[in-house]
Amino acid sequence: MSSSNTPSWTEQLLALQGRPIANQDRQRAALHLVDWFGSVMLGHHSAAGEAISRWAAHASKGACWTVGGQYLNCESAALSNGSLGNIYELDDLHRGAVVHPADTIMAAALAVAQREKVSPQAFLDAVVRGYEVAIRVGLLAGTPHYQHWYSTATCGVFGAATACASLLQLDVHQATNALAQAGMQASGVWQCRMESGFSKQLSSGRSAQSGVLAADLAAAGMAGPRHILEGQRRAMKQLQHPLITIQLHQP
């Protein structure tokens, strides 16, 4: 168990979030957003998309737009768009982390951005921050994690929570709690590859939804385990690499 006086891995990750975001990174995020929208629109017209639309017709209504024309509450919108975006997956794979960040981060950030009525720049900055955390957590998990777990979901939930925390302007303490609550919800096993169905899409959508919930809970004051990434009973027990070998502070 790490000392309570030692910054947790989560806190170290969040310390990086204060760095200025370059315009070229915002432009790259905007390009990924356009590509992701294309994937979502295409997925809407598939069998899986039709099933998601049928579910959305009975989901809790709200102010957040979803592809298909439904206006849902924030969490439901993240689930709907996050699932749709995974049907024809955007190829933004980070090979080292084995994560497709857009599947979870775009859907979560879009939902919260609509609810909070943030600026386009704030949205893109949140996406960049979410991408970084999802990728770094994926690198921590390593490729062995991917053998049994769907890394886009299990690691992407941390990125989704980070993006939402950025949009809500949470401080480091609150954002640490957001990532803690995200880790408590991390899920997604690869049995969905062994059988037909739409469970892979559910995993990405659910992680987007969980990212929204994690940030909202943290904003409300719900504390969580600071050492969710490296503690004795941490999320993703397969995290075996010493932190120094991950070179956390390198870009």
Mark where each language-model region is:
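N-terminal core-entry segment
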Residues: 2-249
